[in-house]
Amino acid sequence: MKSLAKLKAEPGIWLTRTEKPKLGHNDLLIKIKKTAICGTDIHIYNWDEWAQKTVPTPMVVGHEYAGEVVGIGQEVKGFTLGDRVSGEGHITCGHCRNCRGGRTHLCRNTVGVGVNRAGSFAEYLVIPAYNAFKLPDEISDDLASIFDPFGNAVHTALSFDLVGEDVLITGAGPIGIMAAAVAKHVGARHVVITDINEYRLDLARKMGATRAVDVSKESLKDVMTDLGMTEGFDVGMEMSGVPMAFTSMLESMNNGGKIAMLGIPGSDMAIDWSQVIFKGLTIKGIYGREMFETWYKMASLIQSGLDLTPIITHHYNIDDFQQGFDMMRSGQSGKVILDWT
């Protein structure tokens, strides 16, 4: 089958042919229709330090997808041939304390689709049926293919009560932008998002952010004054992994504020703990999506009118994958979709 794989331990990704994956007793075989390029895929493409330590070669990569069930393992119940599905990219062990305690997303033995095992940038993917999510008819393949990062946004945004609250999001990547859209949709008052990438800040405006702030040109304090905010933000979402952004967030939070952190700093990051302690801040680390509460929330948000279509900015046929990766790496895009049909 045709696939995109990390064939060599060097920058790049290659269109190649690999064997069709074998179906296990508890698995689904999925014919891939659409895939989306993730920031993780860019790390793997660039072959940075994280990728070198984490990703085996050769291996088919990718973990954001939508497809159709074309094979069902003999022990699987609840799926039929032709079902449209996306799927959870974190495969969990099922036997550790967190898995058995219903906190599956915190499994200590997680294996990543397209990171530690064969991924979805291929004509076919095999995953455990437990990880598949059946798609409602009104959710398009395009939208379903970005459910993985949308889930990161939803998990982060819904970690704390947002109704009537003022929200600060640092980092206007696709996940940060989708988190802004979720926050407005569920009833936040002001949603302010910061970055230095004007293309993506403009996308955030289209997705409903109250203010999208280029912090290289505009002061966050001035924006708060313009919005009539006198006490700081109630909820923060750190999506950038940039130490300066987190420092700014700590300074801008109201006493008793709550921060959800998804962005991963590139190295050790100094924190002014006096801000955390004297303001009584709560900081929560976010990893992946809650299985599968986040997935049902995602579908419900779209069914209730949340419009994510502006975040999908580019489409390419899989044969033109290099253009898609170049576009993602440029920073001048939202989500980039690769078509396998």
Curated annotation (Swiss-Prot):
Cofactor: how and how many bound: Binds 2 Zn(2+) ions per subunit.
Query: Which BP terms from GO are recorded?
Result: L-threonine catabolic process to glycine
Q: Which SUPFAM superfamilies match?
A: GroES-like, NAD(P)-binding Rossmann-fold domains
Name the residues that bind Zn(2+) 1. 38, 63-64
Predominant location category:
cytoplasm
GO MF, any single term: L-threonine 3-dehydrogenase activity
Catalysed transformations (reactions): L-threonine + NAD(+) = (2S)-2-amino-3-oxobutanoate + NADH + H(+)
**Residues marked Important for catalytic activity for the proton relay mechanism but does not participate directly in the coordination of zinc atom (site):** 148
Compartmental location: Cytoplasm
Give a GO cellular-component term.
cytoplasm
Which enzyme class, named as a word? oxidoreductase
Report residues binding Zn(2+) 2: 93, 96, 99, 107
Quick check: keyword NAD in the entry? Answer: yes
Which family does the similarity line name? Belongs to the zinc-containing alcohol dehydrogenase family.
Function, as annotated, reads: Catalyzes the NAD(+)-dependent oxidation of L-threonine to 2-amino-3-ketobutyrate.
Name-wise, this protein is L-threonine 3-dehydrogenase
What species is given as this protein's source? Colwellia psychrerythraea (strain 34H / ATCC BAA-681)
